[in-house]
C-alpha cells in the first residue's frame, strides 16, 4: 500500500451528527472538509430545487405495501446507472436499496480528494470505516503466502466507484468479440458496445497548461460522444497534475519499442499512454455513480426512490417462480418491498451470488447444507470468480513523488494548502497516471504457457499491464521520493469462488479468489516482475533512479526468491468478476442469459461485474457502466 496514506488522516476533520444536523469541526491543518461539505450542500440544493423536497426521493421506511415497477438491489456502479435510465422518462417507478449511505458524509475527503483514495483502499491496520465498506476478507491464499487478504468493496451510494482507483479504460475489441462468442449474442461485439460506452460518460481532454510538453496525452476522441445529446453523466478526464516519473517511463518504453496508444478507450490496448480517470476536470474531485447518475436522476426524475442504510435479506418469489420483491432490514426492522415488473441485483461480485443463494438459487449441495429450499439448482452461482494482483519492485528516484507525503513535514501541509485553495498539487493525482499494455515476449514464458495463453485469449489481448505507481508497496517513513514500476497479470488461469456458510446476508460471504493458484499464473508473475526490473534498468530510467533497488533488493534474483516476494507483498487488484456469469443455454455453469436474466426463474436479473463471463483485459469500471446502459436499453425497448 502507498506509505503516505497512514498519515493523511491528521489532515481530515471530525464529523458529528447532532439533532439531525451535520456539524463540521476544523482540524489544525488547512481543512479540506469544505470540499465534501460544499459538494453535499450543492447536491442537496439541487435536489430541493428540482423536486421541492429532499425527502421526496428517499424511502418511507417500513410503509406497508410499498411497491415499485423495478426494485434495484445495490446503489453502486451498475445499480445507479440502471436506476437513472429506468426512471428517466417518468413512466416507471424505481426503488434503489442501498446498505450504505452517502460516502461524502460517512467518509469525507478520503473518498473525494483523488490522492486520498488510499486511506481506505487497503487494510493498513489503522484505518477502518465500516460505514462505507463491507470489510471483506478472503480465505487464506496459498499463492500469497497464506495471507487472508482485505478485499475492498464499497457499501455506499456509488459503490466501488467511491472506493476504487478511478481508472477509466475499456477492454480490447477482441475481448468483446470473445464475450459475444461466449454468450452467443452479437450485441456484445465492440461496435455494439460502443454506443453504450459513449452514452455513459463525458470526456474532457488534457489541459495544455500546466501539463508539461513532455507529458503529452493522446486520445482517440472518436471513442467518445461527439455531442452533448449523445454523452452521459460520468466525468472522464486526466488528473490536473502529471506525475514527474511518468514522463521518464514514457520515454523509456518508447525506446523499448512500446507503440503509443490512444488513451485505451478505442478498443486498442497494446502500447503506452497516460490514462484517464473518473475525476471532474473542474472541481478535481472523484466522480462516482452517485455524483453522476444519481445526482442527475434526483434533479430530473419524479419516479426514483432511494432507500439507504437498508440491507436486503432475500428475494421473494410467487408460485410461478417470479420475483415479486425483496425482504429488507433497516436498523433491525424487517419489512418488504414489492416489484411489479422486475428485481435487479446490482450488489456486486460477492453479494449478488450471496443473495441468489440465500433466496434458493445456486448449487444444490450448498443450499441443502444450510436447509435453504432449492428454487433453482444453478451450480454456477458463486463459481468462476476471476481477479488478479498487482506487483513490482520499488526504487528511489530523483524527482518528486507522492511517497514524500509520508515523513516530510513540509510536503503534506503544502499539498493540502495547494489543493484546498487552488485545486493544484500532488493531491489532484491518484498516483498512477501512466499505463502500458504488452503481450508476452518470446522467451519470457515457457513455450507451454505461451501456447496456452495464445489459445485461450484473442490476439489483441495483452498479457500484462504496467503501471507507473508514484509510491511504494511497503510503507516508508523517511519522506524520500520512491516509485514502484508495477505490473498486473491480465491473462490468468486461476479461478476462485464465492459461497455462503450462513443464511444471514449481514454476514460476509466466504470469498476465495485463489490468486496464483495456477502454476502458469505464477510463471507470469515472475516474468512480469523481471520485465518491470528491465524497464527500471533501461538507460533512460537510470538517469532518474537514485540508488539501489529499495524493495525487494537485488539479492532477490532466482525465480523462487522473486515469487516468494510477490506472494508476501503483492496486493489485490480489487476487480473481481464472473460469479453470476452470462453464458449460452448449453453452458452448465451459466447463471444468466445474454439479457442478464437469471435462469430458472422470472422477473430477476443480475447487472454488475458478477455478470461478466470472464475478466476483461484491464479495469472493469467502464464496462460495468456500459453494461448497465445496455441492459437498461433492452428493458426499456421491451426486449
UniProtKB/Swiss-Prot annotation:
The entry's keywords: Cytoplasm, FAD, Flavoprotein, Glycoprotein, Lyase, Signal
GO molecular function annotation: flavin adenine dinucleotide binding; lyase activity; oxidoreductase activity; oxidoreductase activity, acting on CH-OH group of donors
Domain PAS positions: 263-301
Catalysed reactions, semicolon-separated: (2S-3S)-versiconal hemiacetal = versicolorin B + H2O; (S)-5'-oxoaverantin + H(+) = (1'S,5'S)-averufin + H2O
The UniProt record lists the keyword DNA repair: no
EC code: 4.2.1.143, 4.2.1.142
Cofactor(s) listed: FAD
Signal sequence residues: 1-19
PROSITE patterns: PAS (PS50112)
InterPro entries, per the entry: FAD/NAD-bd_sf, GMC_OxRdtase, GMC_OxRdtase_N, GMC_OxRtase_C, PAS
One BP term from GO: secondary metabolite biosynthetic process
Domain of life the protein comes from: Eukaryota
Enzyme class: lyase
Pfam families: GMC_oxred_C, GMC_oxred_N
Family the UniProt entry places it in: Belongs to the GMC oxidoreductase family.
Database matches in PANTHER family: DEHYDROGENASE PKFF-RELATED, GLUCOSE-METHANOL-CHOLINE GMC OXIDOREDUCTASE
Subunit structure: Homodimer.
Protein name: Versicolorin B synthase stcN
Record organism: Emericella nidulans (strain FGSC A4 / ATCC 38163 / CBS 112.46 / NRRL 194 / M139)
Amino acid at each position: 500500500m502507498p506509505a503516505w496514506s497512514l498519515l493523511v488522516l491528521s489532515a481530515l476533520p471530525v464529523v458529528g451528527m447532532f439533532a439531525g444536523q451535520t456539524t463540521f469541526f476544523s482540524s489544525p491543518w488547512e481543512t479540506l472538509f469544505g470540499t465534501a461539505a460544499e459538494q453535499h450542500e450543492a447536491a442537496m440544493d439541487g435536489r430541493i430545487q428540482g423536486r421541492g423536497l429532499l425527502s421526496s426521493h428517499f424511502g418511507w421506511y417500513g410503509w406497508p405495501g410499498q411497491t415499485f415497477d423495478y426494485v434495484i438491489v445495490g446503489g453502486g456502479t451498475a445499480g445507479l446507472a440502471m436506476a437513472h435510465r429506468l426512471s428517466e422518462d417518468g413512466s416507471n417507478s424505481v426503488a434503489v436499496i442501498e446498505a450504505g449511505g452517502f460516502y461524502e458524509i460517512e467518509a469525507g475527503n478520503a473518498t473525494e480528494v483523488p490522492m486520498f483514495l488510499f486511506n481506505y483502499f487497503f487494510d493498513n491496520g489503522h484505518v477502518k470505516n465500516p460505514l462505507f465498506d463491507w470489510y471483506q476478507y478472503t480465505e487464506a491464499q496459498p499463492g500469497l503466502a497464506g495471507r487472508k487478504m482485505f478485499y475492498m468493496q464499497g457499501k455506499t451510494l456509488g459503490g466501488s466507484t467511491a472506493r476504487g482507483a478511478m481508472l477509466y479504460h475499456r477492454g480490447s475489441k477482441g475481448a468483446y468479440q470473445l464475450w459475444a462468442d461466449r454468450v452467443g449474442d452479437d450485441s456484445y461485439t465492440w461496435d455494439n458496445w460502443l454506443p453504450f460506452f459513449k452514452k455513459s460518460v463525458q470526456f474532457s481532454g488534457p489541459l495544455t497548461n500546466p501539463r508539461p510538453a513532455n507529458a503529452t496525452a493522446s486520445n482517440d476522441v472518436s471513442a467518445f460522444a461527439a455531442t452533448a445529446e449523445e454523452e452521459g453523466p460520468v466525468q472522464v478526464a486526466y488528473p490536473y497534475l502529471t506525475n514527474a516519473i511518468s514522463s521518464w517511463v514514457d520515454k523509456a518504453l518508447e525506446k523499448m519499442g512500446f507503440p503509443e496508444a490512444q488513451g485505451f478507450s478505442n478498443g486498442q490496448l497494446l502500447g503506452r499512454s497516460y490514462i484517464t480517470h473518473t475525476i471532474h476536470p473542474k472541481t478535481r474531485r472523484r466522480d462516482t455513480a452517485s455524483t453522476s447518475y444519481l445526482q442527475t436522476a434526483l434533479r430530473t426524475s419524479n419516479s426514483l426512490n432511494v432507500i439507504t442504510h437498508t440491507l436486503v435479506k432475500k428475494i421473494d418469489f410467487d408460485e410461478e417462480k417470479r420475483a415479486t420483491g425483496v425482504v429488507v432490514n433497516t436498523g433491525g426492522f424487517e419489512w418488504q418491498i414489492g416489484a411489479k415488473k422486475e428485481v435487479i441485483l446490482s450488489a456486486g461480485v460477492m453479494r449478488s451470488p450471496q443473495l441468489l443463494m440465500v433466496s434458493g438459487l445456486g448449487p444444490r449441495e450448498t443450499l441443502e447444507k444450510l436447509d435453504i429450499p432449492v428454487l433453482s439448482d444453478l451450480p454456477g452461482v458463486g463459481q468462476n470468480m476471476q481477479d488478479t494482483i498487482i506487483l513490482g519492485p520499488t526504487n528511489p528516484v530523483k524527482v518528486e513523488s507522492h511517497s514524500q507525503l509520508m515523513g516530510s513535514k513540509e510536503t503534506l501541509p503544502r499539498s493540502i494548502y495547494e489543493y484546498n485553495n487552488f485545486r493544484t498539487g500532488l493531491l489532484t493525482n491518484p498516483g498512477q497516471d501512466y499505463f502500458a499494455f504488452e503481450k508476452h515476449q518470446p522467451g519470457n514464458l515457457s513455450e507451454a504457457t505461451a501456447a496456452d495463453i495464445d489459445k485461450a485469449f484473442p490476439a489483441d489481448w495483452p498479457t500484462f499491464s504496467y503501471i507507473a505507481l508514484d509510491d511504494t508497496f511497503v510503507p516508508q517513513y523517511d519522506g524520500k521520493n520512491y516509485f514502484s514500476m508495477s505490473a498486473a497479470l491480465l491473462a490468468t488461469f486461476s479461478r476462485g469462488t464465492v459461497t455462503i456458510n450462513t443464511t444471514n446476508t449481514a454476514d460476509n460471504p466466504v470469498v476465495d479468489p485463489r490468486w496464483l493458484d495456477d502454476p502458469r499464473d505464477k510463471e507470469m508473475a515472475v516474468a512480469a516482475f523481471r520485465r518491470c526490473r528491465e524497464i527500471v534498468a533501461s538507460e533512460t530510467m537510470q538517469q532518474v533512479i537514485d540508488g539501489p533497488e529499495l524493495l525487494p533488493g537485488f539479492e532477490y534474483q532466482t525465480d523462487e526468491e522473486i515469487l516468494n516476494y510477490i506472494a508476501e507483498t503483492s496486493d489485490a487488484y480489487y476487480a473481481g468478476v464472473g460469479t453470476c456469469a452470462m453464458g449460452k443455454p448449453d453452458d452448465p455453469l451459466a447463471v444468466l442469459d445474454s439479457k442478464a436474466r437469471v435462469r430458472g426463474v422470472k422477473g430477476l436479473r443480475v447487472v454488475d461485474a458478477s455478470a461478466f463471463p470472464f475478466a476483461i483485459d484491464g479495469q472493469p469500471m467502464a464496462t460495468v457502466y456500459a453494461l448497465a446502459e445496455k441492459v437498461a436499453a433492452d428493458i426499456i425497448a421491451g426486449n
